[in-house]
A protein has these predicted regions:
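Short, flexible helix-loop junctions that flank or precede catalytic/ligand sites
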Residues: 2-3, 20-29, 37-453
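Long, low-complexity intrinsically disordered linkers/tails
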Residues: 13, 17-19
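N-terminal acidic, proline/glycine-rich, low-complexity intrinsically disordered segments
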Residues: 1-12
Length: 453
């Protein structure tokens, strides 16, 4: 089903009366009868909100945005794109234009355009510029009016290896050793919106699964994309319980239990039994601000089995996404000896650091006499100074000294972090400084990430 023609139409005009060229956009709607979908598409092409509706999405893809957020109010609507984790506001829309484009998307997805309060969800697949995309739509009422969120994802993952994520070889070697071990628990974690699902998938796909049997137990309603060579088993309401599924899986004698969540005390106790008696292994994940927070959450969330879980913990991976400097326009500068000392870098070891090229705002693009001057904008990053993201990783190895520290300082996480740093653990600051020294990112961006922004 092709949505939009490149030929100009007198119906496709902007508010200023100029003709709008609407890009081709193939749309395949999920959960809508094919004949019904065709009828909806034909009808929507005649609506005034069709051009801005299509351009909203195609411009987002061209901009590399992975989210589109629209907030409606009585006066109008404000749309924002999220590019490399940073929200960028678009010019404000009048209410009529915003309502018109929203009607189009709700009609396309088989939703109710008149419903502005209850949550509505839809999904469609599209091919744009020879790339397959899956785009989710959600609208819901909020006190100020209505909020709409588009989530844009590639159908086929681009990131496939730990190197693609930005993980150093030494960290990869340690992590793979943990994942390929036995008689223990490995935790993969990250703050919300910092790429945990992607790292979870890639870490598991890069573990050795050819000589060992890996199984994943998950709630069916939370089902995620398949992970290569990991056999999935699901529990669900109205079907087999988690305990019933685990009992069936245990009979198959897998080597590694993959648990996106620890589910409950019965499952935790059962897996711990397999680890101690059968030398099995477990990998789990959790949303957490850092490695210390991740393990503390797991221990406090399972008080009955906290001691046993701490006893089998082998390592905790945590990550934060950070923007990469644009290779086409980044600027080198010579750091002062004082700055190098502050960063913990030996004098003379790093001759150059890099910073982004950010053009001045339009009102400052004038000469000494106030005449406007032309400022060249980087065509690759469009003046953002950054292009794409990588991850900074901290991998906390849990040995007997660490277990003792967690047991004693679990209620004093800041003191625990201080102990871990004194023990030589390389955290986000150290990893970030190394990334800056390699010219991958800037000190300004590192500071933003360390402040949790």
């Amino acid at each position: 089903m092709i949505f939009g023609k490149k030929k100009k139409s007198t119906d496709n005009k902007s508010s200023a009366g100029t003709e709008i060229e609407v890009p081709n956009l193939e749309i395949k709607v999920s959960g809508v009868n094919k004949d019904e979908a065709v009828g909806l598409l034909i009808a929507c092409r005649q609506l005034p909100g069709y051009p801005p509706a299509i351009l909203l999405v195609t411009n987002a893809i061209n901009t590399r945005a992975d989210r589109i957020l629209i907030d409606f109010s009585a006066q109008g609507a404000v749309a924002r794109y999220r590019v490399d984790g940073i929200w960028e506001s678009l010019p404000a829309m009048d209410r009529a234009t915003a309502d018109a484009l929203l009607v189009v998307w709700k009609k396309i997805l088989g939703l109710n355009p008149a419903e502005r309060k209850a949550r509505q969800d839809g999904k469609f697949a599209t091919n744009f510029r020879d790339i397959d995309w899956v785009i989710s739509f959600m609208s819901t009422g909020v006190p100020s009016g209505e909020r709409v969120l588009f989530t844009i994802e590639r159908k086929k993952p681009v990131l496939k290896t730990l190197t693609d994520l930005g993980m150093r070889d030494a960290v990869q070697e340690t992590l793979k050793g943990m994942l390929n071990g036995d008689k223990g628990m490995v935790v993969i974690s990250a703050p919300a919106t910092h790429g945990l699902p992607t790292t979870w998938r890639i870490a598991l796909e890069n573990a050795d699964k050819f000589v060992r049997d890996w199984v994943l137990i998950e709630n069916k309603k939370n089902q995620e994309p398949d992970i290569i060579n990991v056999t999935e088993y699901f529990y669900e309401d109205g079907g087999d319980s988690a305990e019933q599924v685990f009992d069936k899986v245990r009979l198959k004698q897998p080597d590694v239990y993959v648990l996106p969540s620890l589910i409950g005390p019965q499952i935790v106790e059962a897996v711990l039994g397999q680890i101690h008696k059968e030398h099995k292994h477990m990998v789990t994940r959790i949303v957490a601000s850092d490695a210390v927070d991740a393990l503390i959450q797991i221990l406090k969330g399972n008080p009955k089995h906290a001691k046993a879980l701490l006893g089998v913990a082998q390592g905790v991976l945590n990550q934060r996404l950070i923007r990469r400097l644009c290779e086409s326009c980044k600027q080198a500068y010579q750091p002062t000896p004082q700055l190098l000392q502050k960063l913990g870098l030996p004098a003379g070891r790093v001759p150059k650091l890099y910073k982004p090229t950010i053009p001045p705002p339009p009102e400052q693009r004038v000469d000494a006499k106030g005449n406007p001057i032309e400022i060249e904008i980087c065509k690759k990053c469009n003046g953002r100074g950054y292009f794409g993201r990588m991850a900074l990783f901290e991998l906390l190895v849990i040995d007997d000294n660490m277990r003792k520290a967690f047991a004693q300082l679990i209620e004093k996480p800041d003191e625990l972090r201080k102990f871990i740093k004194q023990a030589g653990h390389s955290g986000f600051f150290e990893e970030g400084v190394l990334a800056c020294a390699l010219g991958q990112t800037s000190l300004e961006e590192l500071q933003r990430i360390l402040q949790g922004k």
